[in-house]
UniProtKB/Swiss-Prot annotation:
It comes from Dictyostelium discoideum. GO terms for cellular component: extracellular region. This is G8 domain-containing protein DDB_G0288475. Belongs to the comF family. The keyword Signal applies.
Length: 1119
């Protein structure tokens, strides 16, 4: 009896405690409402005139002990107990007299001629003696490329290749005490601005460490930027973010509001805290097991007093006829699952909420569907037919850009756009370094004061953020007043909450923190899932922060608008189009930053890249190449977005078929071109893979025979057609008004057709790598900007590298700027040249595949215009391009650039440029032609022979040429040279008895006049054929002279007893076979028009198919 009474009392107390909030609601009347939140912009303090000191702390966790020897993993250990920010240096016996403490993390940028302080406390572990006496301490700032990478795992300090950018050595200091920490301050005054650097402290003793282990203690080591007066505002604030292109921006006005439409004003609402609406007659309590079902046909209003704000509710189900409506009043709800079949309302399009509403998702990691079948656990799921509307206060713009460079130590920044941000909110200032993951310099800052476009932070910036005319670091608002987040303990499992919508959904003004469930498909922070074509769905001005898995996902859903959102610190692809069937969606004015791959980033040592297969630790294998925007189907609109960091900023993988839930949809996703790609920006990406880029059209994603996804990160061709079907006809993939900077290859396109119109590229290794029929026009390609962090020898700059075979590349209306000679370069390819040849291969050789027109080169020495590496390969010997107006050559007439061999010196207009390693000639009426000379079993297209497999030479002859103008020929087929000239082909092993000439590129109206040596008394059968029909098959007849052959119709040959003369013309052509853009033209490589030459000689028959012993004699110069 006593036990029963006690139990009843306990239940009563538990009920009272858990309903204390409900009991505080004054009324259950349908007319009662809590006081709704209102918003008055808080008054900001004035901008303070003093910026505080910035201390960059150095300790055990961000230092590496290095030396030539005498180091180990325990060379640095914890400091003495009770001494804050301290560490111990442990010296082994007979170690070297010198060692280094190298900083693992980026250090602040330092201005020339300003004073900085390096300080530390120091104490000897043993009494001062001959083996622990310090002679000097030196503080050094090195270019990262010059010393051992402190994050690379090695403690061996490589002797720097070059002197430190700045160094300060002191030989006196408080280094002798073994009883107390003595303070040391070293003043640093750099003589040059220091951008990206590695700080290394060299400690030198008077001798080796001796026979006994010694220790030294260091406390509170730091690099300090002293407090100073806030500088006067710059007079040259950026007002236009680009010089050439136009990056669109959202409307400046706030979304229209009408408070009379707010959902909490409806007269037919009932209160959550009204026990009479519940079938049990009791207001539901937080519980670890109960499913709270909203009464059918009811619109239930939640007020702060309605619920317990500390207990965890297990699950809420909203039936199809019901609605759950939140009041615009601040509250916190802890929940595991919410299942929406009806409506979930927390503000609307016309009634954004002002309250601070915090929804905290709780729950341990599981793959059990606790929300509903297929909808997972720990989050909100909206069923097909359901509706969700969540609208927080609008902060606009959600992101902007710097209007001036911000230095390390600054606590005031200037931005370009009007914003209505407020004191106390957090922003992220994006990085201005190339390798975002290696040197993490994104900074989350808190607003202390804001006056118009001037923002002051509570603390100084640690790093340098560039805001020059070329480009400017983004500044994005992270804070929102409605927050969906997971409990902080979820970080250990990366199992956060998720929001999944299979019906219609409208989201605006939400911050999502620690959301997503790592490697569980379909469990993303904000996710439209298999909703088909929607009519009123959008995600606007939200933020995703510290996501475990993605940001904003569109999965098998069309017609969604995703606009003005931001994301920061994200694992896996961020803005994510999942299966390849997603079309007609609009992603506009969004920002993604600091996006991390899952697992080791995809790399590889050649164009193939690497292969990855789906696994429990990599549910989507393409996440090894995670980027800001992942686009499995290009037929969507991308307008005014920006991506900072990631493997790529924008990634277009190739899908031969949809994947996942959409695997049976009968389309080929990779055949769709971009619907709209306008005004997008990407930077600080593309560097994990040699062939990576910030906008990457490449890689392949498919479903294997075992049902697992397979991803290849490398070169995959992409054909694009109108409406995504081959019968629709070929169409070019187009990128308009694009900016790339601090990038590897800017825009990387492995496909067959691409147009890049209006491009700015700054501080990138290359502006792009464009394959197929490619046109780059109206661009600025800037090798070096004013960004201090980009002034490094870590990577070279190339204006554009022409490919080596079977493409067509046209560059028009381009300004190349600031390609400055690198005195440390070892070849033209790393010497910051404007036009670069590709010379590594003998198997792949260029035809006429590259052309330019209207090129302007600024801030660049003429010697830097062309970078051609002389290499013993066909691709080096046959490098060529046409400068259609002579703006590169400076001749003001169409010009042919040819490689280093005299083979390219075809007339008296040709001059050799030693800086360029190239011949430069007036084009005149000539074209560049290419012929594949094949000898079955010896020289054929299927062979892959060594570059040194020389078989002879090709010479120019006739036209008054008397000297030797030749080029090596190897067993790898393909000879490119000048049309309408004599080509004399000599084999050192003897002339083959059968030769097949594929006229791969002999343009319409032009020819090649061949001369080939044979022994006397040889007879010939010469014919031509087109593989695909017999209309142009001819048997050649013998002419009366070589001159008659050259002036003839291309169906004759002549043998003068030493040389066979054959004029080859492609009879299939009609003059339409070319790719033309911007006033430049490249002729097609035309497949399989063949000339056959069969030689017979009974007097001196061939030996193993070759006529040997022939003299190498140039034909007459008068021909």
């Amino acid at each position: 009896m006593k036990y029963s009474s006690f139990l009843l009392l306990f239940i009563y107390i538990f009920f009272i405690l858990n309903n204390i909030n409900a009991q505080s609601c004054p009324s259950t009347s349908s007319t009662w409402r809590p006081t709704m939140a209102s918003f008055v912009t808080p008054t900001s303090p004035s901008i303070a005139t003093i910026q505080p000191q910035l201390d960059f702390l150095l300790g055990k966790n961000n230092l590496v002990f290095m030396g030539q020897y005498g180091y180990s993993a325990t060379s640095i250990t914890d400091g003495p107990t009770g001494v804050a920010n301290s560490f111990t240096m442990n010296y082994d016996t007979w170690g070297p007299a010198m060692h280094w403490l190298v900083v693992k993390t980026p250090v602040p940028a330092l201005k020339a001629n300003q004073n900085y302080e390096f300080s530390f406390g120091f104490k000897l572990g043993q009494v001062l003696g001959s083996y622990n006496k310090i002679a000097s301490i030196s503080v050094n700032f090195f270019n990262p490329a010059d010393i051992t990478d402190p994050n690379g795992g090695s403690q061996y300090f490589v002797t720097p290749a070059h002197p430190a950018v700045y160094s300060k050595t002191v030989t006196t200091g408080s280094w002798t005490s073994s009883t107390t920490f003595a303070q040391n301050i070293i003043t640093l005054t750099p003589t040059v601005d220091i951008g990206l650097s590695i700080m290394a402290i060299q400690i030198t003793r008077t001798s080796q460490t001796g026979p006994a282990i010694t220790t030294m203690f260091v406390s509170n080591m730091k690099l300090s930027i002293p407090s100073r007066t806030v500088p006067a505002p710059p007079t040259n604030l950026i007002t236009k973010d680009s010089e050439l292109i136009a990056i669109p921006k959202p409307l400046s006005s706030l979304d229209a509001q009408d408070s009379t439409t707010c959902p909490y004003l409806a007269t037919d609402l009932v209160h959550w805290h009204d026990p009479t609406i519940w079938t049990s007659g009791v207001v539901p309590l937080p519980s670890t097991s109960s499913n709270i079902i909203i009464p059918a046909g009811k619109k239930v209003l939640i007020s702060p007093c309605s619920i317990n704000q500390t207990g965890i509710y297990q699950k809420i189900t909203i039936p199809a006829t019901s609605e759950l409506i939140f009041a615009d009043a601040s509250l916190t709800m802890n929940i595991q699952d919410i299942y929406v079949q009806g409506k979930f309302i927390m503000g609307t399009t016309k009634c954004r909420y002002n309250a601070n509403i915090n929804i905290v998702f709780n729950g341990a990691m599981t793959t059990v569907d606790t929300i509903a079948q297929y909808f997972g656990s720990k989050g909100i799921a909206v069923a097909s037919g359901g509706f969700i509307s969540v609208h927080g206060r609008q902060y606009h713009n959600t992101w902007t850009k710097l209007a001036a460079t911000a230095w390390s130590g600054d606590n005031v920044i200037y931005i370009q756009d009007d914003v209505n941000w407020i004191v106390g909110q957090q922003v992220v200032v994006a990085t201005s370094v190339y390798q975002d993951e290696k040197y993490p310099e994104n900074e989350v800052m808190t607003i202390a004061a804001i006056q118009g476009k001037v923002i002051q932070f509570t603390e100084p910036l640690k790093y340098y953020h560039y805001g020059g005319q070329e480009y400017q670091a983004e500044v994005a608002l992270l804070t929102r007043n409605i927050v969906f987040q997971s409990e902080s303990s979820s970080a250990a499992s990366s199992f956060g909450g998720h929001v999944l919508v299979s019906g219609e959904g409208q989201f605006a003004g939400i911050q999502l923190i620690r959301m997503g469930q790592r490697n569980i498909k379909g469990r993303y922070p904000l996710h439209f899932h298999m909703a088909n074509t929607v009519s009123k769905s959008y995600i606007s001005d939200c933020s995703v922060v510290s996501s475990y898995y993605r940001c904003y996902t569109i999965h098998a859903t069309n017609n969604v608008t995703v606009t003005r959102n931001v994301a920061f610190d994200v694992n896996g692809h961020c803005y994510y189009l999942e299966d390849g069937v997603e079309m007609d969606n609009t992603l506009s004015f969004n920002f993604a930053s600091y996006v991390h791959t899952i697992g080791t980033p995809a790399a590889g040592y050649n164009q193939y890249g690497q292969d990855f297969t789906q696994s429990s630790s990599l549910a989507q294998p393409a996440d090894v190449a995670a980027g800001g925007f992942y686009i499995t189907n290009a037929w969507n609109s991308f307008i005014g977005n920006a991506a900072s960091g990631g493997w790529a900023g924008f990634s277009f993988p190739n899908l031969d078929a949809p994947i996942g839930n959409s695997i049976n949809v009968p389309i080929v996703p990779k055949q769709f071109t971009t619907k709209v790609f306008q005004g997008n920006t990407a930077h600080s990406s593309g560097y994990f893979f040699e062939f990576g880029s910030s906008i990457y059209v490449g890689g392949d994603l498919s479903t294997g025979s075992d049902g697992l996804l397979v991803y290849n990160s490398g070169r995959i061709s992409r054909e694009t057609y109108l409406n995504g079907v081959e019968s629709g006809g070929e169409i070019w993939m187009r990128f308009n008004n694009t900016k790339v900077y601090l990038s590897n290859r800017g825009i990387g396109m492995w496909g067959e057709r691409v147009e890049v119109i209006l491009l700015e590229s700054h501080d990138s290794i290359r502006p792009g790598s464009l394959f197929g029929e490619a046109w780059l026009s109206d661009a600025i390609v800037n090798g070096q900007t004013g960004n201090l962090l980009s002034k490094t020898t870590d990577y070279s700059r190339q204006g554009f590298q022409f490919y080596d075979t079977y493409v067509k590349t046209i560059l028009t209306n381009i300004i190349f700027r600031n390609f400055v000679h690198n005195p440390l370069s070892t070849s033209p390819e790393d010497d910051n040249r404007v036009i670069i040849s590709m010379t590594h291969s003998d198997e792949f050789k260029p035809q006429f595949i590259s052309a330019t027109k209207n090129i302007t080169i600024q801030g660049t020495a003429v010697s830097q215009y062309i970078g051609h590496r002389i290499f013993d390969t066909g691709s080096s010997r046959q490098f060529n391009f046409v400068d259609y107006d002579g703006t590169i050559s400076g001749r003001s007439v169409p010009t042919i650039f040819g490689a280093h061999d005299k083979w390219w010196q075809f007339d008296n207009t040709c001059t050799y440029n030693n800086d360029w390693n190239s011949w430069v000639c007036n084009k005149g009426t000539y074209e560049v032609a290419s012929v594949s000379v094949e000898v079955p079993g010896y020289m054929d297209r299927s062979g892959e022979y060594d570059a040194t497999s020389n078989v002879g030479y090709i010479y120019l002859f006739g036209s008054g040429i008397t000297d030797s103008r030749r080029m090596n020929v190897t067993r790898n087929v393909g000879i490119t040279g000048i049309s309408d000239f004599g080509w004399y082909l000599y084999w050192t092993v003897g002339t083959p008895s059968y030769i097949k000439l594929w006229l791969s590129e002999v343009p319409y109206g032009h020819y090649v006049f061949f001369a080939i040596p044979y022994p006397a008394s040889t007879t010939f059968k010469v014919s031509c054929e087109y593989k695909y029909n017999s209309q142009h098959s001819y048997n050649f007849t013998q002419a009366t002279s070589a001159a008659a052959v050259r002036s003839g119709d291309g169906k004759k040959y002549y043998f003068n007893g030493t040389h066979l003369f054959v004029k080859v013309i492609n009879f299939v052509l009609n003059g339409s076979e070319y790719f033309s853009r911007g006033g430049a033209k490249i002729n097609d490589v035309y497949w399989e028009f063949i000339v056959h030459i069969t030689a017979t000689n009974t007097v001196k028959p061939p030996v193993n198919g070759f006529y040997t012993g022939l003299t190498d004699v140039l034909p007459s110069s008068t021909l």
